[in-house]
Amino acid sequence: NASFVEEKTHPLFALRVRDFRLYWLALVTQVVGQHMFAFTLGWLTFEITGSQAQLGLVHLCGFVPQFALTLLGGVLADRIDARRLIGAAQANAAIAMILVGAVTLLGVAQLWHLALGAFLWGLSAAIDEPARASFFPRLLPRPLLRSAVPLISMAFGSSRVIAPSIAGFLIAAAGAPATFLVCAAAVSTMVAVLFLVHPAHSAARPHESLLNSFTESLRYIRANEAFARVIGVALLNATLAMGFIHMLPVFAKDVLQVDSRGLGILAAAAGVGSLAGFISYSWLQTRLTPRNLIVGALTVYNAALIGLAFSEWYWLSFCAILVAGLGHGYFVTGAQVILQTLVEDHYRGRVMSVFALVWSLMFLSGFLLNVAGEWAGPRLALAGGAAIVLAYVWLSLVRAKTLKKLVLVPKPG
């Protein structure tokens, strides 16, 4: 009945499972460290160079390994113990953060140091994202996936609330080097927790060539129109709009004229909105069809970004970012619920690695929007990208018959 379905999809239901609860707490800590690192790296880059284009270049260096290797990470996640992949990725991320912190502490930080730090972090994320997406479903019964996925999204949303504020105040109080070291400690937490959980056994699969394994997953996605539509619009939105978070240093300094604390509050607004979306998603998914939820979320998100682009007032910008975060929370969670619920286990790592390109494309988006902003101004760059996504959503996505009829029934393992 309806009350039973609502209980099973409530995020807190999955936290009753010990292993998933431990993993989720470690994930929150890890992602806080990651967002703090990205925030601090962007702030330091703009502080040292004062160049919007060079800020975009650092983001591009984080994007390249993620975009190039995330799909490989998905193939590896379907054939290697995901726990090993996650542990190795987070150890590498911690080393990168320590190295950037060290050169900053010594006062010798240059643009190439920051670009290298972004590259190493992107390399870690390329392996970590699909491995995590393949790993956490093995920590709890399959019927609880619709409860667990919003919690995973909530981990990212809560970190976006906490991380920018922590980073902004740490930078002001203790400096960037101390902030980088705190980031390294945070991401290392996941490595320790991996030894405390006991995931379900993952059945061995034939080890065909990497290329065949990858092309097989693309055929699988293409054969499922719902997957193709959801992943396609997610990648478009990531490329043209999600990089707005990497433009905030420019809006904060040049348009709104605030310091690192003010920038931290603006960045946190996106997290507050996303967190509100993640928390209320379980209620919303029982009242809207998956298609209507995704279309509505993308509309709210991109309309809010257009509002942000032309805002002259700090608190109006704050509200626009807050609303954008809400739309982002609904969309990302809804898309992942569709994919994680319907995908078959032996394709999970590869399918989710294609979706994980969303996060690496944020760096490309940051690069494109910042370069376009240098040429046409940040307002037109941001509004133009959001307008293109809105046009696609209403001219194409709303007409997709497969999404109209979509019912979320889990595939057997």
Predicted regions and their residues:
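Helix-loop junctions on the cytosolic side of multi-pass membrane transporters
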Residues: 134, 138, 180, 184-209, ...
